[in-house]
């Protein structure tokens, strides 16, 4: 059975916090990356540790998430960009 690996990213203005979840179980402690080429390389290094490509999930935070989205697209990494209002509504209903 194939694992479901998700990298959840909380994007802020200067840095982002990354949490890894495998089959709905949080793996270790979240880590922080800078929102620049050095931070994105660190993210790529973590993504490449897995045999299957993880799905990256993040909220659309306007200008703050644009560089992350561009990086993911350039590197052909699957991602899901959430509408923040819909994400909050989903969380409030659970």
What are the functions of these language-model segments?
Residues 1-94:
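Phosphate- and other anionic-substrate recognition elements at nucleic-acid/protein interfaces
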């Amino acid at each position: 059975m194939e694992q479901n690996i998700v990298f959840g990213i909380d994007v802020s203005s200067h840095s982002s916090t990354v949490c890894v979840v495998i089959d709905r179980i949080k793996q270790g402690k979240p880590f922080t990356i800078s929102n620049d080429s050095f931070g994105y390389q660190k993210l790529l290094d973590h993504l490449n540790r897995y045999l299957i490509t993880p799905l990256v999930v993040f909220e659309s935070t306007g200008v703050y998430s644009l560089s992350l989205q561009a990086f993911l697209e350039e590197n052909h990494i699957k991602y899901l960009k959430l509408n923040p209002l819909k994400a909050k509504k989903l969380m409030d209903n659970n």
